[in-house]
Amino acid sequence: MTTASSKVAIKPLEDRIVVQPLDAEQTTASGLVIPDTAKEKPQEGVVLAVGPGRFEDGNRLPLDVTVGDVVLYSKYGGTEVKYNGEEYLVLSARDVLAIVEK
């Protein structure tokens, strides 16, 4: 797979992807506002850029995700990056647990 990107000038290498985390719920079902200190880290995000894949035995292995996919990822996986005032997460493809089909 060739490197694809959307809306972001970050080009991931090898089997890495750039994800924009989706915002966590701001209120409970009963209408209570959840303070920032009580919110869990989001584990869902939109794929904005995909690396070309990693090499194994001389062959490049393509990734299972594409730009625009909504993915679930490991709670503590990846590296948080702030670029041009936006927050992104750079993940290894191994940190992606599932693709959400909506």
From Swiss-Prot:
A single GO molecular function term of this UniProt record: protein folding chaperone
Entry's localization field: Cytoplasm
Gene Ontology terms: cellular component: cytoplasm
Example GO BP: chaperone cofactor-dependent protein refolding
Gene3D superfamilies: GroES chaperonin
Domain of life: Bacteria
Pfam families (alphabetical): Cpn10
Subunit note: Heptamer of 7 subunits arranged in a ring. Interacts with the chaperonin GroEL.
Cross-referenced PANTHER family: 10 KDA HEAT SHOCK PROTEIN, CO-CHAPERONIN GROES
Function recorded in the entry: Together with the chaperonin GroEL, plays an essential role in assisting protein folding. The GroEL-GroES system forms a nano-cage that allows encapsulation of the non-native substrate proteins and provides a physical environment optimized to promote and accelerate protein folding. GroES binds to the apical surface of the GroEL ring, thereby capping the opening of the GroEL channel.
Family statement drawn from the similarity comment of this UniProt entry: Belongs to the GroES chaperonin family.
Protein name: Co-chaperonin GroES
Organism: Streptomyces avermitilis (strain ATCC 31267 / DSM 46492 / JCM 5070 / NBRC 14893 / NCIMB 12804 / NRRL 8165 / MA-4680)
